[in-house]
Amino acid sequence: MKVGFIGLGNVGGKLAGSLLRNRIDLTVLDRNAQVMADFAARGAGIAENAAALMRECDVVITCLPSPAISAAIMDEMLPEVGPGKTWLEMSTTDEAEIRRLAALVEQKGGTAVDCPVSGGCHRADTGNISIFAGCDRQTFERVLPLLTRLGRRVLHTGAVGTASTLKVMTNYLATANLLTCCEALVTMKAAGMDLATTYEAMKISSGTSFVHETESQLILNGSRDVSFTMDLILKDLGLFQTIAERNNVPLEMSPMIIDIMKDGQSRYGERANTDDIIRRLEEATGLSILAEGFPAELIDDEPEEPGYEVFPPGRARPVAAE
């Protein structure tokens, strides 16, 4: 199987690295020539353009920063789509747009899967990231061996579009967690508590979360370098808000979270790291939310292990259609 990968950014580059590490025949494409040269030095092929990549590969994976960019890339690839071609969309994108693009692929005889990832760049780097996959069951069974080279836990979410719907929900939850962690840390500092002790108390309590156990460390170190930027999270929050509005759900926290992140973006820059949002409260209180003993970057300390499918509670393994 020949695999193409478009988009070698913070997440995409690490996912593509997992394919190389697992000896997949890989060809890459990115607008950054130096990044492509680095992949070539590691054994990857280099594509001239998206159309050539689709023409030469059995599977093409995209991991891009916005729905508009994904659509533009698909416009280039579509003339080369046909029977035997598979498109895996690993970008965080709009569920209606992924269904539209998937329909175009299917009209040409190809197959499409929306399969965004979750778990952070550090887990993408080690192949331990989680993957949601939206497609019919037969297609899922066919692409599962490739997905388990990219990540550890793979969840079949249903039809095309369901994975993207769930993905933006998880990013909404992660942002809500981040903001509450920021408020908790600043309040404890103001109350005279030691921040390292505060971190540990949160970690071993009912108030812990994946975001706390990862991003709070970067906040306390001072690097705030989570490799995820405010423009990207605002895109994802907007997609989640759109889903709620489309389904007549009167959200209260979501608009507030969007306003806070927009304010952070206006203060610190469009592509500031999301963890820089702590600075709003540091500036408001005059407090420094720093502590010794925390890392500047996240390292996944779990060893890479073979990926596998996970199932919702009470669900048995389905049988693929004949």
Predicted regions and their residues:
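Rossmann-fold NAD(P) dinucleotide-binding segment
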Residues: 50-111
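Hydrophobic residues within alpha-helices
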Residues: 15-16, 101, 146, 187
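NAD(P)+-binding Rossmann beta1-loop-alpha1 motif at the extreme N-terminus of oxidoreductases
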Residues: 1-63, 85
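Helical "substrate-binding/catalytic lid" subdomain
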Residues: 162-284
